[in-house]
Amino acid sequence: PAKLPLNEAIDEYIVHLKGENSWILGRFIIPISQFKDLEEFLPLFDSLGPLRLSVLGGGGKTDDEYLNNIKQNIADINDFREKHSGKIEIDVIECKLATNTPSKSIMQKATDLLNENDLKHFHEFAELPYVGIDYSTELDETNWDSEVVSTVAMISKMDNAGIKLRCGGIVKDAFPSVEKVAAMIQACSLNKIPMKFTAGLHHPLRHFEE
């Protein structure tokens, strides 16, 4: 659905909701910036129950900008919740970090705000560094441990938090290497933090030679 126009994505989602395999269907994922576009389709769910949403937010170039974006995201979410009470449920937000090494105090403030507003949260790294092991010393000679592992460990201490890993897209950098995927799974497993994968299904190949 992510590569379809919103009306087609909604139509397809409803078809699957009415199908025999609806039990496996997750939340409909949408950027917060598209809330207004979504409104016209909400009556389609009157007979299906509330539309369950996972929303995309966060981002920014600095920690302070990230926190301000989170505050605005929460305000927009609560406005949408109030306006369409009983028709939608928003209980998950996926947030892109501003940097790979965010301030602990900023992250604590952001996650506290998200928790206070009944939102589980998955955090996506700004840009994953290269994973490289020197097999003679078994040491990682890159920034993976100092940036990614330390940040995963920090976020794992925060309530209702998870890690998001992008696994596909239309550019080369959107495809993590096998080593990055394995290292991220290991980091999340060791720190006992939930993780989710995204984008791998609708963009399995970044280029077609046509």
Task: Show which residues each predicted segment covers.
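Alpha/beta catalytic barrel-like cores
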Residues: 1-105, 113-126, 139-144
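Alpha-helical scaffolding segments of alpha/beta enzyme cores, especially the outer helices
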Residues: 79, 109-112, 150-154, 179-190
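Structural recognition of alpha->loop->beta junctions
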Residues: 81-89, 155-158, 190-193
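Short, structured patches in soluble enzyme cores that scaffold and shape functional sites
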Residues: 97-99, 128, 133-137, 165-169, ...
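Active-site glycine- and acidic-residue-rich loops that bind
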Residues: 102-103, 130-145, 171-180
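Noncatalytic carbohydrate-binding groove/subsite architecture in carbohydrate-active enzymes
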Residues: 110, 125-136, 150-151
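Extended repeat-based interaction scaffolds and adjacent low-complexity, acidic/S/T/P-biased segments
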Residues: 146, 153-160
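Catalytic alpha/beta core domains of metabolic enzymes, predominantly
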Residues: 160-210
